[in-house]
Curated annotation (Swiss-Prot):
Binding sites annotated in the UniProt record for Mg(2+): K191, D193, E194
The protein, known as: Ribulose bisphosphate carboxylase large chain
Family: Belongs to the RuBisCO large chain family. Type I subfamily.
Enzyme class: lyase
Lineage: Eukaryota, Viridiplantae, Streptophyta, Embryophyta, Tracheophyta
Organism, scientific name: Combretum indicum (Rangoon creeper)
Cofactor binding note of this UniProt entry: Binds 1 Mg(2+) ion per subunit.
Length: 465
């Protein structure tokens, strides 16, 4: 074979519209905005090339391997309705390109270099189809939804949480006191804020000790199992594991990790530790909006959610649909199903580009958190269903009578919504009525209803299809 040096069009090698995808391929849907004058086939092929075997020129070492076996292929391109010069390009990657059990390696290949590519004005990874053969190389969530319910002995309702505020500046003892008050009032969980690690005003070991004390005291008083998400995120993997070990020694039921800032390698290590040692793992998605908020560049959160289910976590923050943080209902429910369910059909109206079979990988509980309060309870119960954690930070600690009454108000509101739903009432239509009725029997709830009656965070959502 003669070796022909020089630059050649990507589309000659990497655009293959006749390709039949294999069950073992990793499939990706990219939203591609080519530079003016670059045809979509060339742009799509360039994405496939740069995220797999290609480089900018022909190299003679290409002859030493079988490119046809290892190359990514752009197999379908469709224009995006309503957008000028924007396309969805579908790319298939052979499974052999990826290391088993490594989300890190998967992302390094698929979204590594290609996003800085000159021929593209913008590029967004909208969805991935992970083949079952690859899923089986991951351990996934340490416990999953059913095991968590069994550990906590809580069934038939969403779980309630609260982020301890002010997020920075409290001493360990005062922090532990807030934990105790919230749990005693009726919450299931309290939470370290994502940026509470180990700062001068509160070192991690002190916080863990006082929080554990608060948990046990609240458990003794209420007869319910309680937990506090002890944030184990640290500057090194070794330090992170050290914190998780200490949490386990205290008998804590759950630890927490910031998986994007901490990184997938650290997260997978922690998930393995939690699996081996019976700890639940709560995942916070700090930094996600840096990656997923722009509509035409970056990566959609549903991809980050799938990656987390592979890497491992029992809870993950997933937006509220109703609070202060962005998230459109159908789209949010799309990736909530991707987190919880075992098998999800392709449904473009919910942003799901591929049918995904998780082959019994445990599910992840979505966490709704951010600017929500008692008036949102019917909507949240309706939207997220039982397998969710509803987190009210300011919505608990902002109660005029204090933390414990704030927790009582949320618990009463939740129980009222669940009961109404079970009786067949329509939460969407009668939500306010249900909360009003319940507040007659609960002065704590009545006070909460009074404080937050008019608050709304009304802006148009950016994330539309």
């Amino acid at each position: 074979v003669g070796f022909k040096a020089g630059v050649k069009d990507y589309k000659l090698t990497y655009y293959t519209p006749d390709y039949q995808t294999k069950d073992t391929d990793i499939l990706a849907a990219f939203r591609v905005t080519p530079q003016p004058g670059v045809p979509p086939e060339e742009a799509g092929a360039a994405v496939a090339a740069e995220s797999s075997t290609g480089t900018w020129t022909t190299v003679w070492t290409d002859g030493l391997t079988s490119l046809d076996r290892y190359k990514g292929r752009c197999y379908h391109i469709e224009p995006v309705a309503g957008e000028e010069n924007q396309y969805i390009c579908y790319v298939a990657y052979p499974l052999d390109l990826f290391e088993e059990g490594s989300v890190t390696n998967m992302f390094t290949s698929i979204v590594g270099n290609v996003f800085g590519f000159k021929a593209l004005r913008a590029l967004r990874l909208e969805d991935l189809r992970i083949p079952t053969a690859y899923i089986k190389t991951f351990q996934g969530p340490p416990h999953g939804i059913q095991v968590e319910r069994d550990k906590l002995n809580k069934y038939g309702r969403p779980l309630l949480g609260c982020t301890i505020k002010p997020k920075l500046g409290l001493s360990a003892k005062n922090y532990g006191r807030a934990v105790y008050e919230c749990l005693r009032g009726g919450l299931d969980f309290t939470k370290d804020d994502e940026n509470v690690n180990s700062q001068p005003f509160m070192r991690w070991r002190d916080r863990f000790l006082f929080c554990a004390e608060g948990i046990y005291k609240a458990q003794a008083e209420t007869g319910e199992i309680k937990g506090h998400y002890l944030n184990a995120t640290a500057g090194t993997c070794e330090e992170m594991i050290k914190r998780a070990v200490f949490a386990r020694e205290l008998g804590a039921p759950i630890v927490m990790h910031d998986y994007l800032t901490g990184g997938f390698t650290a997260n997978t290590s922690l998930a393995h530790y939690c699996w081996d040692n019976g700890l639940l793992l709560h995942i916070h998605r700090a930094m996600h909006a840096v990656i997923d908020r722009q509509k035409n560049h970056g990566m959609h959160f549903r991809v980050l959610a799938k990656a987390l289910r592979m890497s491992g976590g029992d809870h993950i923050h997933a937006g509220t649909v109703v609070g202060k943080l962005e998230g459109e209902r159908e789209i949010t429910l799309g990736f909530v199903d991707l987190l919880r369910d075992d098998y999800i059909e392709k449904d473009r109206s919910r942003g799901i580009y591929f049918t995904q079979d998780w082959v019994s990988l445990p599910g992840v509980i979505p966490v709704a958190s951010g600017g929500i309060h008692v008036w949102h309870m019917p909507a949240l119960t309706e939207i997220f269903g039982d397998d969710s954690v509803l987190q009210f930070g300011g919505g608990t600690l902002g109660h005029p009578w204090g933390n414990a009454p704030g927790a009582v108000a949320n618990r009463v509101a939740l129980e009222a919504c669940v009961q109404a739903r079970n009786e067949g009432r329509n939460l969407a239509r009668e939500g306010n009525e249900i909360i009003r009725e319940a507040s007659k029997w609960s002065p704590e709830l009545a006070a909460a209803c009074e404080v937050w009656k008019e608050i709304k965070f009304e802006f148009e959502a950016m994330d539309t299809l």
